[in-house]
Amino acid sequence: MMRARVPLLLLGILFLASLSASFATSLREEEESQDNPFYFNSDNSWNTLFKNQYGHIRVLQRFDQQSKRLQNLEDYRLVEFRSKPETLLLPQQADAELLLVVRSGSAILVLVKPDDRREYFFLTSDNPIFSDHQKIPAGTIFYLVNPDPKEDLRIIQLAMPVNNPQIHEFFLSSTEAQQSYLQEFSKHILEASFNSKFEEINRVLFEEEGQQEGVIVNIDSEQIKELSKHAKSSSRKSLSKQDNTIGNEFGNLTERTDNSLNVLISSIEMEEGALFVPHYYSKAIVILVVNEGEAHVELVGPKGNKETLEYESYRAELSKDDVFVIPAAYPVAIKATSNVNFTGFGINANNNNRNLLAGKTDNVISSIGRALDGKDVLGLTFSGSGDEVMKLINKQSGSYFVDAHHHQQEQQKGRKGAFVY
């Protein structure tokens, strides 16, 4: 009897051991994923909504599902659209305000209005200062064309859902990938609405024989020419005078604020070895998307998801299609490990300020000065005297983007510093 129990006991021990190991592995993976709640790796953070031989649509996972620290972004989503040359994204509407930024290629965007009205926009990434962008009001039917015969089109969209944090796209077309939303209406509703027999409605709108392979389809070059005429003749006025551009031989930053959406759009280009010096935004929560290249980023914030007087550095190695979130008031520095460019969206952009912590100009530390009855506030703030602090600051003759080729990065542990209320 005892002999029979021994194998069972061993099996039980082995089962518990494997269960414990599995739990430990799961816990470790969860802890690792929480090590940097601001970093979204392109390999596992994008969810594909549609894909065929002509392109794809994919959406980044919800920000607030990654970390409670990002719960203020629960009403914002990132969407990426890519399409091959001479293709059309079929007409649709979404339950979200959309802000489109063209990152490569060119596009013809058509907004459909009531009473047979349409607005045409020709958008391109060729603008040397800033890629074209366009706002699409929620519920507006629109379609997109890639008119270029050779170059792929890539668009990044900031979506602001109006119903709930999920985005719902409503396509009129019935394709192999999905049904037209009109098909969900009952037979008698459709017949009364179109004043036609259901058989005719089904043949004209929904019949499988005429269906496309998906929501991204090939388009005839003659149709593209006709659309291009409308788009170029109706092209909107340049907004370049509203741009705020700063740059030097190491990098360029261009920003533009859409006051109606309270959103900042930014474009950052950096040469390999360049450093965007430590800085922070006063109000805006910035969502950075890597378009091309690689970079090392360091963000300083409170340690852990709690009120604390300790802070730590959240570091990440960024590459193409990665996303990084920079909360308001969190200092950040970016070093280009190759030529790199980003698209940024800043939430809460109205009355936002960018504050630099190093460099010759716009440096808030050097602005502290002497304000307490003539006393040296800088000297009280740091271990050195105010003169020593200013001497240190003035050693850097560059601003915003500086050369970091010859400076090695040092690892630092978290220490007490920022006050969190």
Curated annotation (Swiss-Prot):
Residues 237-390 form the Cupin type-1 domain. Glycans are attached at N252, N341. It comes from the Eukaryota. Keywords: Glycoprotein, Seed storage protein, Signal, Storage protein, Vacuole. The keyword Signal applies. Residues 1-24 form the signal peptide. GO terms for cellular component: aleurone grain; vacuole. It comes from Phaseolus vulgaris. Its main location: other. Transmembrane segments: none annotated. InterPro entries: Cupin_1, RmlC-like_jellyroll, RmlC_Cupin_sf, Seed_Storage-Functional. This is Phaseolin, beta-type. It holds the Pfam family Cupin_1. It is found in: Vacuole, Aleurone grain; Vacuole. Homotrimer that associates to form a dodecamer. One of its GO terms (molecular function) is nutrient reservoir activity. Belongs to the 7S seed storage protein family. Major seed storage protein.
